[in-house]
Amino acid sequence: MITETEQAYIARIREYFGNELVSVDTHPGDWSDGVLRSMLINAPAIYVAWLGAGEGRTRGRLVSHWVFYVIGDMLNGREASRPGLYQIVARLIAVLNGFRTEKTSPLYFEKAVN
């Protein structure tokens, strides 16, 4: 179910952003120099990763924790054709907050950190 959920998030992001992002993909799982270099070269981009799950408020249910790494080549995109980090993050929250797959509860925004 984790893979299906991740793929649904990626598909939703790709559909919403169209060709504005160079890459929308799964985070490769490590922070090696090669991974960082690739992520920076392919900006702007969004990478999705599942961080794990904990016990939910309802018995027998889990609460999954997801992270969306947003990579940009500028903070504030002033040109319409080049979104900055601020614009990407705002739009990402708008398109994913409350989004649900067939088998999951809605995704809710918790926090953004820099």
For each feature predicted by the language model, list its residue ranges:
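Charged, amphipathic alpha-helical segments and their flanking helix caps
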Residues: 1-114
